[in-house]
Amino acid sequence: MWYAIQVIGGRENTVLAEIKRTVDPECYKEVFSPKYETQKKIRGEWIITTAPLLPGYLIVDTRQIGAFSTQLRKVKALTKVLGSNESFIPLTRPEMKWLDSFTNNPHHTVGMSTAVKEGDRIVITSGPLMQHQGLIKSINRRKSLAFLEIQMFGRTITTKVGLAILRKQG
């Protein structure tokens, strides 16, 4: 089962490294920070960079959440497995399916999507957003970002993914 670990936003990579160093690997199958690719213009050149898909959260795949949570106390950074009272709540099947379909690679990274502008419509031509245009709530062309509204952790959240709009047509 997959569980969400809440961490301080911007410290996902640091906490991830500390968990891998500190927590007994027998307690979990995998722990990761889902990411997305986007483009940034640096010194006039477009560079592909990555950023957290779910800022402030890590995902752990474990069948021993009690043992993992106990081991997680060894980590010096602020960490909390999401749950209610004394039980931990795993990600639902749709949440796991969404994450897995978007990040279907060993690095758990959502690749860059590309699109063209036809009149006042944006048409996705390639990438993971091709089958999920309905999730797009807004687009920032200048920053090559699409903002998605999804159900995750029992509530509606807005997240970003990379979207390069190549040219205008029509």
Predicted feature residues:
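Acidic-enriched and Gly/Ser
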Residues: 1-121, 143, 147-170
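Short, conserved beta-turn/loop elements at beta-strand boundaries and strand-helix junctions
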Residues: 127-129, 139-144
